[in-house]
Amino acid sequence: MKDNQTEVESRSTDDRLKVRGNKVGKKTKDPNRPKKPPSPFFVFLDDFRKEFNLANPDNKSVGNVGRAAGKKWKTMTEEERAPFVAKSQSKKTEYAVTMQQYNMELANGNKTTGDDEKQEKAADD
């Protein structure tokens, strides 16, 4: 027993400190599920990262790139952000279509693997 604790209190404290394993009802992620589309900022970040790395080839810090991108994004006007917003919207519509196809395949019981899709693309080429 611990200092000034009864046996019951001691046991309940020990039970709370135990490491818990995986939750019983936790779902695993489907590797074939389409990735969510990027936000306008992340579309901007892809372009900005390329420019930043060309301007600062000796920079190894990911944080510096993110900080600089965030500062620039905050100072941009709506007109400057418009191409990134448009690209993000087009990716959202593509995502909606691919998710609809994915959900139809799941409903039909056809789970496709990435290997099958790669083989189909290779056959088309």
Swiss-Prot record:
Region named Disordered: 1-40, 106-125
GO biological process: chromatin organization
Tissue distribution of the protein: Mostly expressed lateral roots, root tips and flowers (including pedicels, but excluding ovary), and, to a lower extent, in cotyledons, hypocotyls, stems and leaves.
Subcellular location: Nucleus
Keywords on record: DNA-binding, Nucleus
Compositionally biased intervals (Basic and acidic residues): 1-18, 113-125
Task of the protein: Binds preferentially double-stranded DNA. Confers resistance to salt and drought stresses.
Family in the record: Belongs to the HMGB family.
Protein name listed in UniProt: High mobility group B protein 5
Organismal lineage: Eukaryota, Viridiplantae, Streptophyta, Embryophyta, Tracheophyta
